[in-house]
Each structure stands twice: as structure tokens, then as C-alpha cells.
């Protein structure tokens, strides 16, 4: 046999922004957004896949701009973050959260672990393959919306490996 491709996988972080998540890095988020956009409810409302991104308007919460938290400035002390008072950490606006795919809102799906997602997306081959590869590498405990900035070097490395393996 011949080597078709060689990939170097390091422990470098996979995202510099909390907007980068396990689901966005692996490409699973694009497919999940398409599933939501294909629902009858989304079609009736005229929502495309972009509506289910917490990175763009419309769709994301206007208060926290899709972050799920807001910065709180404290006098004489370092600032901190607090759960968004409008979306309560959901990252999306109220209208977007009214759309359900198989009984679940988009923010609920982002709260699923890789193990849950593997089961629930079993009928969707690309998603099942993505979450299967992550689970096989011992990452079944991570949630789909887990911020890339909060991953350890080893977790980031295994996510990169899983992403390459499921291509």
C-alpha cells in the first residue's frame, strides 16, 4: 500500500474563541443546523440554517450576542462573567428556541454529550460517524456545545484525530 495522506496532530488549541465548540470544530454543527432548518416549523417561519447559528443575527440572543454569558464589571475587582439574563445561557433568541427537531430545541442539542448525540443521530450517517469517532477516542462525556477554549491539550488532540478519522 501507499500512504495517501499524512496528518500531523498537535496539542495546539482548536479554537481561540468561546464561539468555537466541539460541534463547530468537527463540522457537526452545520449538519445539525440543516436538520433544524428542514423542520416544518422552521420552513413555515422562513428560517434557514443560518438562523440556528449562535454566531450570527438573526437567531442568536441579542443581549449576549450568542455567548450565553455577559461580562460583569466590578469596581476595584477583576470583572467576571454571569449567565445571560435574557436567554439564561441558551445563546439563542426566544423565536429560534420555539423550533424543535424531534422534540428538542437547538440549545438542548448543544447540551447533549457525545454519547447522547451518537444515539440520537444514529439515523444520520455523517453525524453518527462524527460522534462515533469522538466516543471511540474516549470523548463521550463532552457536550456538543463545549467551548473549545476550555478543552485540555489532550482533548483537543483527540478531537483533531477524530475529525481526521471520520473524513
Q: Predicted segments — roles?
A:
Residues 1-167:
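Conserved phosphate-binding elements of NTP-dependent enzyme cores
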Amino acid at each position: 500500500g501507499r500512504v495517501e495522506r499524512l496528518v500531523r496532530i498537535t496539542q495546539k488549541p482548536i479554537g481561540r474563541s468561546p464561539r468555537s465548540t466541539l460541534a463547530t470544530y468537527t463540522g457537526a454543527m452545520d449538519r445539525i443546523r440543516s436538520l433544524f432548518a428542514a423542520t416544518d416549523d422552521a420552513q413555515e417561519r422562513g428560517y434557514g440554517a443560518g438562523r440556528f447559528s449562535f454566531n450570527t443575527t438573526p437567531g442568536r440572543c441579542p443581549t449576549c450576542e450568542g455567548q450565553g454569558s455577559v461580562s460583569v464589571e466590578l469596581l476595584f475587582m477583576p470583572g467576571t462573567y454571569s449567565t445571560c439574563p435574557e436567554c439564561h445561557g441558551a445563546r439563542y433568541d426566544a423565536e429560534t428556541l420555539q423550533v424543535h427537531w424531534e422534540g428538542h430545541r437547538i440549545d438542548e442539542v448543544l447540551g447533549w454529550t457525545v454519547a447522547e448525540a451518537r444515539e440520537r443521530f444514529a439515523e444520520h450517517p455523517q453525524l453518527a460517524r462524527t460522534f462515533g469517532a469522538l466516543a471511540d477516542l474516549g470523548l463521550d462525556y463532552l457536550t456538543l456545545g463545549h467551548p473549545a477554549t476550555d478543552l485540555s491539550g489532550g482533548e483537543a488532540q483527540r478531537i483533531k484525530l477524530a475529525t481526521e478519522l471520520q473524513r
